[in-house]
UniProtKB/Swiss-Prot annotation:
Identification of the protein by name: Argininosuccinate lyase
Domain of life of the native organism: Bacteria
Species of provenance: Macrococcus caseolyticus (strain JCSC5402)
One GO cellular component term noted in the UniProt record for this chain: cytosol
PANTHER family found in the cross-reference section: ARGININOSUCCINATE LYASE (PTHR43814:SF1)
Keyword Protein transport: no
Biological process annotations from GO: arginine biosynthetic process via ornithine; L-arginine biosynthetic process
Gene name in the database record: argH
Pathway given in the UniProt record: Amino-acid biosynthesis; L-arginine biosynthesis; L-arginine from L-ornithine and carbamoyl phosphate: step 3/3
Length: 457
């Protein structure tokens, strides 16, 4: 095998098996643009501080830009024996412009180089995830406004509980996503710090200007400690943690959609574009996209725990274990972006079976709390009202009727002060619009909630 760029101290080259085990180019090739961006900033700084000449800097920068052109034209092949994206690019540069290309790495280690690449990539991907979350939030708001009068059963323990507005239920996910978005935005503060100039771990003897490279790369600051800069990946774990919460919320929403589009619920109908069929059962229309998103939430959880376990026992400073920070991280980023984008399209094209939803609450016992509350207004203590209502529900079940079908005379046998207005109180629309608390399910409250959500956007 060819001698490695770091091979001056070695008498023997790696075996092919060891080189293949050691390489990471198949994973970190993704950092191609970030690596060149960081190198151009570094070389620009080397020129500014007179560590290299203007002519040398121009040759290197032009060479790097030429490598980008070659790459985009499909004329670049990365080599495993060069280990990673950093050495592959450096080798390409030296081949293109000669020995002056070797000056690019002056005052820099691969340790601060890869950390810089990862910070740049993490920042870009975090911003992309935030943008994708916003798009989904817009769809949720639109869906809520479109169906703001539709009543559905609300659930606890997956049992019908109380009538609520469909829009109130759907807006729940807007606020979950809003917190997800806030976590990603807040995390940018920890990502937007430059490790460049930290060297392998101890800094450098060259008169570099780290604040200048930080500004060129649009970082807010420079790491205060060079060891910290190259040895930790907490900002990666931070993003992966946030992805886990995001995917958990999408998984919960997916689970509901899976239930809702079943024959047993029939709350919604998914577009054909987001479903699949069966190879043996012709009638099937499967919510595979929702199921995949639900399943992938487990995958990103595994990625997160994998990196957490990798880092937890590492001594300072850099260790090769940190090469394992990328595969699960990149997969989690891809999964999050794809999942949010697919989910956005699925919800945007989803049909709400409004008439069916409203009919359900007209024919169940989700209005039982209204009856208990009504009895309280007659002076009956709530615990007694709760007991009486439970007995009335049991009476209705035994007689195969609903609360609205119980004769007034029977109600008055419970309490003589009950009047005909009890039937109005039992109406689901009346029940919904009595929930006037600021965050309740009344039409007024939900429309105010939607208006508040639009302000966040």
């Amino acid at each position: 095998m060819n001698k490695a760029l770091w091979g001056g101290r070695f008498k023997e080259s790696m075996s092919e098996q060891v080189a293949d085990f050691n390489q990471s180019i198949e994973v970190d090739a993704r950092l191609f643009y970030q690596d060149i961006k960081g190198s151009i900033a570094h070389v620009t700084m080397l020129e500014k501080t007179h560590i290299i000449t203007s002519d040398e800097a121009n040759q290197i920068i032009n060479g790097l830009q030429g490598i980008i052109e070659d790459y985009e034209a499909g004329n670049v092949t990365f080599k495993k024996e060069l280990e990673d994206i950093h050495l592959n690019i450096e080798k390409l540069l030296i081949e293109k412009i000669g020995p002056v290309g070797g000056k690019m790495h002056t005052a820099r280690s691969r340790n601060d180089q890869v950390a810089t690449d990862m910070h740049l990539y993490a920042k870009e991907m975090t911003e992309a995830i935030i943008t994708s979350i916003k798009a989904l939030q817009h769809v949720i708001i639109d869906l809520s406004k479109q169906h703001h009068t539709v009543i559905m059963p609300g659930y606890t323990h997956l049992q019908r509980a109380q009538p609520i507005l469909f829009s109130h239920h759907i807006m729940t996910y807007f606020w979950m996503l809003e917190r997800d978005k806030a976590r990603f935005s807040e995390g940018l503060k920890r990502i937007n710090i430059s490790p460049l100039g930290s060297g392998a771990l101890a800094g450098t003897t060259f008169p570099i200007d780290q604040q200048y490279t930080a500004s060129l790369l649009e970082f807010d600051d420079v790491y205060a400690n060079s060891i910290d800069a190259v040895s930790d990946r907490d900002y990666v774990l931070d993003i992966m943690h946030n992805i886990n919460l995001l995917m958990m919320h999408l998984s919960r929403f997916s689970e509901e959609i899976i239930l809702w589009c079943s024959e047993e619920f029939k709350f919604v109908t998914l577009s054909d574009a987001y479903t699949t069929g069966s190879s043996i059962m012709p009638q099937k229309k499967n919510p595979d996209m929702a199921e995949l998103i639900r399943g992938k939430s487990g995958t990103v959880a595994g990625n997160y725990m994998g990196l957490l376990m990798t880092i937890k026992g590492l001594p300072l400073a850099y260790n090769k274990d940190l090469q394992e920070d990328k595969k699960g991280f990149f997969d989690s980023i891809d999964t999050a972006l794809q999942s949010v984008q697919i989910f956005t399209g699925m919800v945007d094209t989803m049909e709400v079976n409004a008439a069916h939803l409203s009919n359900i609450t007209q024919n169940d016992f989700s209005n039982a709390t209204e009856l208990a509350d009504y009895l309280v207004t007659l002076g009956i203590p709530f615990r007694d009202a709760h007991e009486i209502t439970g007995q009335l529900v049991l009476y209705a079940i035994d007689n195969n009727i609903l609360l609205k079908d119980i004769p007034l005379a029977h109600y008055q046998g419970v309490n003589k002060d009950i009047t005909n207005d009890i039937y109005t109180k039992l109406d689901p629309e009346h029940a919904v619009n009595r929930r006037l608390s600021d965050n309740g399910t009344s039409t007024k409250s939900v429309m105010n909630q939607i208006a508040k959500a639009e302000q966040y956007m």
